[in-house]
Structures are given as structure tokens and as C-alpha cells.
Curated annotation (Swiss-Prot):
Annotated source species: Schizosaccharomyces pombe (strain 972 / ATCC 24843) (Fission yeast)
Functional summary from the UniProt entry: Involved in ribosome biogenesis and cell polarity. Required for the synthesis of both 40S and 60S ribosomal subunits and may also play some direct role in correct positioning of the mitotic spindle during mitosis.
Protein name: Ribosomal RNA-processing protein 14-C
Domain of life of the organism encoding this protein: Eukaryota
Subunit organization: Component of the 90S and 60S pre-ribosomal particles.
Pfam families according to UniProt: SURF6
Lineage of the organism: Eukaryota, Fungi, Dikarya, Ascomycota, Taphrinomycotina
Cell location: Nucleus, Nucleolus
Length: 233
């Protein structure tokens, strides 16, 4: 039988294990909370930097307009700038950041923007954007690339999936086409099997009908002949 001292030792060891487990669980919870707070700080910092960048771009745009006006070519320069911005669908005083929009340094909540939801549409959109950017001058390309960079940073911070990698999109399309072909082949094979099964059923039916007809003919041929009545003398 166990002594009282032995039981006390077991209880002490069990209590120690429980305490260790609780300490480890609390430490894990602290790490998870610290990680969550760190992510929130990074997201807030990225938003603040994006807002700061939008203010700088807005200020540079205003200074550019003033300089153009001072040279006496304000109307033509502003008109050209607005036309270029309209064609390239880029407004330098506006920066899209995740689901938010910074316009002239002020945060505006952006409505849901409809865009390509499938990889085929995403690839076409990316290729068209690439061609459009390549046709622009170096300054416009730089501004668009800077805006896109912040956009990617914030989307990644929010854990959203990016669809701006041309190679990955093409790889995804090849995989989908392969799956589509596999599905098409399976559908064709199923239809062929159904057709073969139908032909086999039809063939068995015709064979059964033929056997029945032959059986009826055979029975008629074996039927006994009726005896003629004998003549009375």
C-alpha cells in the first residue's frame, strides 16, 4: 500500500505539471497578442506613410500648376495633364490603399471596386496595364510603381491574396486548362461508355426477340398431325 508521504509526492508532482502547463499556455497567449498588436502597428504605420505620400503628391501637383500658370501656359498644361490622367486612369493626388482612398491627403472610404475575379480576367487586366504603363514617360511610370508598391504592402499586411504576378497567373491558367481538359476527357469517356452500354442492351434485346421467334417456329413444326377419320364399309 502507498504511504501518505508517497501520495503527497504524487500530488505535488501533478500540481507542478499543471502549473507548468498553465504557464506555457499564458506565454503562448502573450505571444499571440503581441503578434496581433505588432501587425496592427505595422498596418497603421503603412497607412500613415501612404497618407503622407498622398499629401506630397498633392502638394507637388499644386506647385506644378502654379509654375505652369506663371509661365503663361497654365491652360494648355493643365488641360494636357488632365487628358493624360484620364487616359492612364491615374490621379496623382489620389492613392488607393486597400479598401481606403487618400485624396489630397484626406482619407475617404472607397466603395467596392469591381475588377476581374478570375485568373483569365486578371491576366488580361495585368497585360493591358503593363502595355499602358510602358507607353508612359518615366515620371508617370515611377509614380504608378510607387503607388502600386504601397498597395501591395497594405494588401499583404491585411492577408489578402495578390493577383499581380504574371508568371503565377499563367501557371494558374495552365493548371485550370489541364483540369478542364481532364474533366472534358472524363465526360467524353462517360458518354462513350453510356453509348456502348445502350448498344449492348439493344443487341441483347434483339437477340432475345430472335430466340423467341425461333422458339415459336420450332414448336409449330413439332405439333402432332391430326388423324383422318376412317371410312365405314
Amino acid at each position: 500500500m502507498e504511504t501518505t508521504e508517497g501520495k503527497n509526492d504524487l500530488r505535488a508532482k501533478l500540481a507542478e505539471k499543471i502549473q507548468t502547463f498553465r504557464s506555457q499556455r499564458k506565454a503562448t497567449e502573450k505571444v499571440d497578442r503581441a503578434l496581433l498588436l505588432q501587425r496592427r502597428k505595422e498596418k497603421a504605420k503603412a497607412r500613415a506613410e501612404a497618407k503622407k505620400l498622398a499629401k506630397k503628391e498633392s502638394k507637388a501637383k499644386q506647385e506644378s500648376k502654379v509654375a505652369a500658370y506663371d509661365t503663361g501656359n497654365s491652360s494648355d498644361n493643365i488641360a494636357d495633364e488632365e487628358n493624360d490622367n484620364h487616359k492612364s486612369t491615374i490621379t496623382y493626388g489620389t492613392l488607393i490603399v486597400g479598401d481606403d482612398k487618400f485624396s489630397n491627403g484626406k482619407l475617404k472610404v472607397a466603395g467596392k471596386k469591381r475588377g476581374p475575379t478570375d485568373v483569365f480576367g486578371a491576366l488580361k487586366h495585368l497585360e493591358a496595364k503593363k502595355r499602358r504603363i510602358e507607353s508612359m514617360d518615366e515620371e508617370k511610370r515611377r509614380k504608378i510603381e510607387e503607388s502600386d508598391k504601397w498597395h501591395r504592402v497594405l494588401l499583404q499586411a491585411e492577408g489578402k491574396k495578390l493577383k499581380d504576378n504574371e508568371q503565377l497567373l499563367k501557371k494558374s491558367i495552365r493548371r485550370k486548362e489541364k483540369e478542364k481538359k481532364k474533366s472534358s476527357d472524363a465526360w467524353k469517356e462517360r458518354k462513350d461508355n453510356e453509348k456502348k452500354a445502350m448498344l449492348m442492351r439493344q443487341q441483347r434485346r434483339e437477340e432475345n426477340l430472335k430466340k423467341r421467334r425461333e422458339s415459336k417456329k420450332s414448336k409449330k413444326g413439332k405439333a402432332p398431325k391430326k388423324k383422318k377419320p376412317s371410312k365405314k364399309k
